[in-house]
Amino acid sequence: DYDENHSSMALNQINTLLQEREEEDDSTAQEQPNVILILSESFFDVTRLPGVTFEEDPLAEFHALQAESISGSFHTRSLGYGTCSIELEILTGLNNRFLTYGTELTSSDPADLAVFPTVPGLFQQAGYSTYFLHMYNDSIYNRRELFSQLGFDAMYFSEDMAQVDPEAAQAPDYWGYLDTKISGAYYSDAYLTELFIDLYEQYGDDRPLFLYGAT
């Protein structure tokens, strides 16, 4: 049966919640925190491995950050290959699964990507400075041409680090200096962190920053 009193109470509760939400939105509308997005190929949550246990949490700080913030999982059909396709999925919201069989986002005409809303593009429209760092060269996926359509103010690859790192710019042997930043076979995540700090020190006083790094 229709309960008029119950429905009226429910509507009042909804109205109260909406008013509270509007007040929260108004109070945070002017906040523009710096945002850093990192896709790291060298990190994963080892506690999610099936059948593996640890006496102590090896990622206690990471899990603490997850608990006090917003966290979740991202699912992709790519595993062990096609890293740039995963990047484009995240930055554009497009899913490789729905493309024609045998095609990937990386094979798109760069001009086609320009018509879609993107994460860096939305930040750019909101008044952010947007920068992309890749800890390798541009010899595989043609990232420079593809990502130039996504809304980045500037992009930096291994051959461009002197534009970010003052020590690299002053080094007598540029590539020799970069060799000191290698851990294993590739440039370390620690060096990516240093470069983010350099970008913040160069541009952080002007506008809020969106920094995207791929290792």
Q: At which residue positions do the language-model features occur?
A:
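Conserved functional hotspots at enzyme active or ligand-binding sites that engage polyanionic ligands
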Residues: 4
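Solvent-exposed soluble domains appended to multi-pass membrane proteins
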Residues: 12-33, 37-40, 45-215
